[in-house]
Amino acid sequence: MKNAEIAAMFEKIADVLELRDENRFRINSYRKVARVIGDLTDNIEDMARQDRLKDIPGVGEGHAERIGEFLRTGHMHKYDEVMAAISAFFMY
């Protein structure tokens, strides 16, 4: 199941946003979704196939798009973006 992998990605995004001192509500949103997805008993891939991602508490249009992108492509642009930014930060 991809649940744990996606939950970890959302948690890491929240960590980086927090390091960058970004909007607290946005950080909390990512943390909540990470926690909820990590606790899901349903397979998130099945939920995506059934167009039920937005049934997950805290998952709106943006988070659903990110999850769907990862399930389709194996990559999440937002995750890649924040990880690249934090890597660049620690290089200097």
Can you describe what each PLM-predicted range is?
Residues 1-92:
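Long, highly charged, low-complexity intrinsically disordered interaction regions
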